[in-house]
Amino acid sequence: MMHRPEGAPAWIEAGPKDATATLVFLHGIGGGKKGFQSSVDYFASLEYRALAWDMPGYGDSLALESLTFKNLAQSLEKMLDVAQVNKAVLVGHSMGGMVALQAWSQCPERIAGLVIAASSPAFGQQDGDFQQQFVAQRLAPLNAGKTMTQVADKLIPTMVAPNALPVGATLAQYPEGLALAHACMSAVPPATYRASLQALVKFEQRSALPTISVPTLCLAGEHDKTAPPEVLRRMAQKISGAEYECLAGLGHLMGFEKEAPFHEAVLKFVRRHF
């Protein structure tokens, strides 16, 4: 079921409201709630309550006047209020993992657990020149008049494991999961993509890691070049009691590449702790 309330982000959900755990899926910079529809359905079928949001500015959610991680976490808390979720297990992929860490800093009382997947506690380098170069490189196609579909054409093959796509694959040759990832990225409004990139390079929550006191899983993809396994492993070491798992044969788009191992890892974690 899709919800689009006034004053809060839109989300989809399924599953019983009295479930032993409520999972909230948070997508990345090129995603949307539709990318987690199968995850919502899967966990609801196992009697968990599951939600997936459209981050502000994405899909059915209105854009924020200023897209910052602080404001994104506030929007997430507002969605939890409207959805009547007291405590949630946040499952954040890529930029969504950063939103989850920011939410821990701002409203830890609303968080029962964390799954940080293919993400990082800070942008790669805090050097201003590096940030500007990163943003310029990512925005160059849009600045040259390319569409988000053309951005997806170029980016997605660089974010998956070797052999996940045939060399030079056309969209018609994409496996179903990666075709979904392509559709999600293609649908991101260019203005939102620009604003998200500017926020991304300013993200910094490394100091929050030792304060995390809820069950946490740091989930890596073996072939992820965007958030390499070593980044996730080191993050887990800085969180008391955190678990680390690396999904063999997968890249940055782990759940889109093969959803079964992603679901299995999250399910094992949830069953252990909730």
PLM regions with names:
Residues I212, C218-A220:
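Short beta-strand/loop motif that positions the catalytic acidic residue
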Residues Q125-Q132, G145-P210:
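Conserved alpha/beta-hydrolase catalytic His-Asp/Glu region
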Residues A242-F274:
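Catalytic active-site module of serine/aspartate enzymes centered on a nucleophile-bearing elbow/loop
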Residues M1-V24, S45-Y48, V85-N86, P157, ...:
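Alpha/beta-hydrolase fold catalytic core
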Residues H223-A227:
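Acidic catalytic loop of the alpha/beta-hydrolase fold
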Residues N71-A88:
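Conserved acidic catalytic loop of the alpha/beta-hydrolase fold
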Residues S105, I111-A144:
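Flexible "cap/lid" loop of the alpha/beta hydrolase fold
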Residues I12-L62:
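Conserved HGGG/HGGXW glycine-rich cap/lid loop of the alpha/beta-hydrolase fold
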